[in-house]
Swiss-Prot record:
Family indicated by similarity: Belongs to the histidinol dehydrogenase family.
Keywords: Amino-acid biosynthesis, Histidine biosynthesis, Metal-binding, NAD, Oxidoreductase, Zinc
Protein name: Histidinol dehydrogenase
Cofactors, names only: Zn(2+)
Pathway: Amino-acid biosynthesis; L-histidine biosynthesis; L-histidine from 5-phospho-alpha-D-ribose 1-diphosphate: step 9/9
Organism: Aquifex aeolicus (strain VF5)
Cofactor binding annotation: Binds 1 zinc ion per subunit.
Name of a matching Pfam family: Histidinol_dh
Amino acid sequence: MRIEDLRKEDWKLNERLEYLAKRGEILEEEYEKSVKEILKRVREEGDRAVIEFTKKFDGVELTPENMEVPFEELEKAYEEIEPEVREALEFAENRIRVFHEKQLENSFFKEEEGIILGQKVVPLEKVGVYVPGGKAAYPSTVLMNVVPASVAGVEEIIMVSPKPNKYTLAAAYIAGVSRVFQVGGAQAIGALAYGTEKIPKVDKIVGPGNIYVALAKKLVFGTVDIDMIAGPSEVLVIADERANPTWVAADMLSQAEHDELAASILLTPSEELANKVKEEVERLLSQLERKEIAQKSLEKFGTIFLVKDLYHACEVANYIAPEHLEVMVREPMALLPELKHAGAIFLGDYTTEPLGDYVLGPNHTLPTGGSTRFFSPLGVYDFIKRSSVLYVSREGFKRVANQAEAIAKAEGLTAHALAVKVRKND
């Protein structure tokens, strides 16, 4: 794991920093052509293309008849998993539900002398949830994506996941998924966006995935809505000299094991801590079941940056705009006002990112690749839409007609002005 020095006035010119800050753009250029081809074929060929790509990328032989997982399999998985895992998933589901219920919006109406104005809030009808599979299975991702949709009142929740295991299926049962299809990758995103013979077209697609999934979501946006660009995972840790190097290293490795394209970054003003964390990462790496994946991730995107002080660390963190931001310093609350761009901010030594992944309650589906500058964590608000509601009586019309007509004439829209004028004589 490399150590870079940013304690200079021109720190933004550091090549490694620029590489990490712009990694979303770099990855897109590399994979976009193949993703476009996959989407094109799914749109034109439907299930046939989905089945072909599933065999090619996942090594799974599908037919139109077995693409959908029978609901009985979800119930069976729920009953078969270990009692402690079932209890943990139900515990997490409840905490996630309670947190997200606070995000619910209500319709409102305001009345004023012949005019009623308001906003009607309604849930989306049909949503697609992508849950990663393959190299790892994520029942927690099922809960984090499905529960907010359930809280919002979405009528039909369609889940897609390549080779879902019993824990993923059990979580789908607990969270209230409507239907499950065992497909993944860009082909699954295309199927949800365009619809196939078996997989229904949805109104919105949510959920994290690899670079193929993230790019596919970006490319189908407009045909359907999406939650965000949630690609390979990232963690950035700000730590001072008193931070525990083993804890810091463990938290960095917890992201590196996700994906070979995951990024693990440390910002610290302490050279001593930087060297100790580097040693601990190397020591702990050998203990991981997924050490090969973590090793490749660290080689590509793992970096320790030396900074001038903690406020400089905040400036660098805002420049990178990470998915997960951990603050392991003596007074973490003091830095919170300085932190502008992060999907989730974990304050304090004990607030390790995996707690947020699983059981705390706030959503773990977060924007990546620098998109925390304009995207927010997944929430109930992603599964609702708003319609403006307007009512004007004859009396209310007289209060606003002249002004509306004047603006219409100024814009040269005579039919607009006429629509107002013809009502004045009533």
